[in-house]
Amino acid sequence: MTTNTGKVTQIIGPVIDITFPIEAMSSVNIYDAVVIEDKTEKLSVTCEIQQLIGSQSVRTVSMSSTDRIKRGMDVVQTGTAIAVPVGKSTLRRIFNVLGQPIDNLGDVKNEETRPIHRSAPEFVDLDIRLEIFETGIKVIDLLAPYRRGGKVGLFGGAGVGKTVLIMELINNIAKAHGGVSVFAGVGERTREGNDLYAEMKESGVIVEDNLLESKVTLVYGQMNEPPGARMRVGLAALTMAEFFRDSSKQDVLLFIDNVFRFVQAGSEVSALLGRMPSAVGYQPTLATEMGGLQERITSTKDGSITSIQAVYVPADDLTDPAAATTFAHLDATTVLSRGLASKGIYPAVDPLGSTSTMLQPWIVGDSHYECAQKVKQTLQRYKELQDIIAILGLEELSEEDRLTVDRARKIERFLSQPFFVAEIFTGLAGKYVGLNETIFGFNKILSGDLDSYNEQAFYLVGNLTDAEGKMKTISEN
């Protein structure tokens, strides 16, 4: 490791110019980390080199606040990119972009670190099989299945169950796939990060006393952080996820909340560095930066990283360059509906609004595809009839339409499911439902075999056996 020392020459917000001796410039690389240190001020600020300007100067972006930094302060060249700890010792811990724990639980007992800037896996190492990633959540597995090693966009406003869905996915991947999860909080509210951590402890996703039972690592670069930290925190989390995939040979779930903030931070940094803006004021390197992050999220022959990314759409404009660039990388979309949440149907996943490239007969098989299409057709017809029902009432419908409405209401309720992580709120035992059980149950409803059942028998149950048991209880009462 080289430790050539330079001096701070200019400070413009989070952008800092540094001068090194001319003989030290040969060892300076783009994306290397440098540390501004001042013992009298008790100051240590890490910056990342972004540009080489002139024969002796570099332009850097700070990863933390630049308060109290003065011209003439010493800068130590590390000779390497920002590196973060990796491995099992990171589970249940919260880190910042530099891989430093911020949860007041002491240092991480870990010797291995990895630089956050890494190239995507080589083409020959990729696993190109089209394989469904079973989540155990009926509505997702049936209507908008995830691809193993794929990327999913999660769309939903406040209070519709996004956090609970994320926690259930973390819980299910640990139980069904023996995998772990990494959560990247990119530019979101500090309160939300704190609430998520508290809820994970309450629901058992994080077990404070037992490292091996904990299933998640959290990396936060929140809204109050400088743009450099928000731009790099996604890469820090991805580096930790890559280690679990490559070394532990596990299926890993990577959550990014919110991928728009990653683009937004890149836009801020680009403007601060004086680059000419592109469309709508975004950075000219938008597609390159997004590709650099997304192409590392993939399946290899060792394991997979399946990514679920919350996507904020500015002003609901799907043509916004940030949203449009993100959509190009997604394999599936999971849309959460406030209308379903208001009916108490959880998970409030919109069965008609959610999509997946995996829902093709040659990938999922004919029986799965046909069942999903029939479910969607039934729900679509119910949606079309709702205005007529509201004005004229159910009695004015034809016999066939009344049957469709009855089955659609049963399907709507059967798409709900009790979650393991919500047991403490609902008092109902969580259910993991296999894909075959899901298809069997919905086919039974569609065929008319269960027309005599009360629709409440299908509400918040797992498989068809649970619905039959609930119907028996309803009949007895």
From Swiss-Prot:
Record: residues binding ATP: G156, G157, A158, G159, V160, G161, K162, T163
Keywords (A to Z) from UniProt: ATP synthesis, ATP-binding, CF(1), Chloroplast, Hydrogen ion transport, Ion transport, Membrane, Nucleotide-binding, Plastid, Thylakoid, Translocase, Transport
PROSITE patterns: ATPASE_ALPHA_BETA
A single GO BP: proton motive force-driven mitochondrial ATP synthesis
EC number, as in UniProt: 7.1.2.2
Membrane topology: Peripheral membrane protein
Keyword ATP-binding attributed: yes
Cellular compartment(s): Plastid, Chloroplast thylakoid membrane
The protein's enzyme class: translocase
MF-aspect GO terms: ATP binding; ATP hydrolysis activity; proton-transporting ATP synthase activity, rotational mechanism
Recorded catalytic activity of this chain's protein: ATP + H2O + 4 H(+)(in) = ADP + phosphate + 5 H(+)(out)
GO cellular component term of the entry, any: proton-transporting ATP synthase complex
Gene3D superfamilies found in the cross-reference section: 2.40.10.170, Bovine Mitochondrial F1-atpase, Atp Synthase Beta Chain, Chain D, domain 3, P-loop containing nucleotide triphosphate hydrolases
Pfam annotation, one family: ATP-synt_ab_N
UniProt cross-references to InterPro entries, sorted A to Z: AAA+_ATPase, ATP-synt_VA_C, ATP_synth_F1_bsu, ATPase_a/bsu_AS, ATPase_alpha/beta_chains, ATPase_F1/V1/A1_a/bsu_N, ATPase_F1/V1/A1_a/bsu_N_sf, ATPase_F1/V1/A1_a/bsu_nucl-bd
Subunit annotation: F-type ATPases have 2 components, CF(1) - the catalytic core - and CF(0) - the membrane proton channel. CF(1) has five subunits: alpha(3), beta(3), gamma(1), delta(1), epsilon(1). CF(0) has four main subunits: a(1), b(1), b'(1) and c(9-12).
Role, per record: Produces ATP from ADP in the presence of a proton gradient across the membrane. The catalytic sites are hosted primarily by the beta subunits.
Family, similarity comment: Belongs to the ATPase alpha/beta chains family.
Identification of the protein by name: ATP synthase subunit beta, chloroplastic
